[in-house]
Amino acid sequence: IIMIADMNCLKIINDEHGHDKGDEALFKLASYLKKHFGPIGECYRIGGDEFCVLAPDVSIEYFEEVCQCFRASLEAEDQETAYPFSASMGYVRLDESGIDECVKKADRKMYEEKRRKGRVRI
């Protein structure tokens, strides 16, 4: 499984609360990704506010359970911060189409979720 995660509202955090809070939010998101997905795969920051999780040896059902725990953690953190704290994620099963195509599919799914209403979208 490959997942692409993108922090929501980073520009708002930077503009309204300062870049130090934006950096803090990115660090928190990375920490939550590592906490939840680290035991089942590898987590990478691939761009400004974009992250990637590779979990090739886990079932989709278990991955979805981990996603729900991750989502609950982000929602709880959002209640505790003075700024909006959320992320959108998209994931796909790795297949024979190759890693590049799977990344594109996961990225498209993430952007579909980002367009929907709600704070933490998976």
Residue ranges and their predicted role:
Residues 54-56, 92:
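Short hydrophobic/aromatic beta-strand micro-patches
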Residues 35-40, 69-82:
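Short catalytic/binding micro-motifs of nucleotide second-messenger systems
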Residues 42, 58, 86:
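Ser/Thr-centric signal marking residues that sit
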Residues 57-58, 97:
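Hydrophobic/aromatic docking surface of two-component receiver
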Residues 4-6, 90:
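Residue-level recognition of well-ordered beta-strand positions that form the cores
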Residues 19, 64-71, 75, 92-122:
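Catalytic-core segments of nucleotide cyclases and related cyclic-nucleotide turnover enzymes
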Residues 45-46, 74-90, 118-121:
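Catalytic core regions of nucleotide second-messenger enzymes
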Residues 1, 8-38, 44-48, 52-53, ...:
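Conserved long alpha-helical elements within nucleotide-processing catalytic cores of c-di-GMP signaling
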